[in-house]
């Protein structure tokens, strides 16, 4: 899968760095998302766990070419959103 990242114009670095997220963590979530749903304006939202156990929300847009996407941002789930995600995952596992 070809993954491109939005780069912060001020630094030239991937925007995800502003949220202390690495490219590898984003790839972990995108390869095995716990949830993947429609976002705004054609974007998609993937929620999932990294190999080391962090739960992330990744906002991305599928590219026109197959097996390619553009990551806008990603950040760690905390508080109520994290609790709700874990609850949904437990319920999904009980089915």
Regions picked out by a protein language model, each given a short descriptive name:
Residues 1-95:
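Ribonuclease/tRNase effector modules and their secretory precursors
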């Amino acid at each position: 899968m070809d993954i491109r990242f939005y780069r912060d114009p001020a630094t030239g670095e991937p925007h995800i760095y502003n949220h202390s997220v690495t490219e590898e963590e984003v790839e972990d979530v995108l390869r095995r998302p716990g949830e993947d749903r429609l976002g705004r304006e054609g974007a998609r939202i993937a929620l999932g766990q990294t190999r080391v156990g962090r739960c992330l929300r990744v906002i991305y847009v599928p590219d026109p070419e197959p097996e390619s996407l553009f990551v806008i941002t990603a950040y760690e789930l905390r508080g109520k959103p994290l609790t709700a995600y874990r609850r949904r995952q437990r319920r999904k596992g009980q089915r």
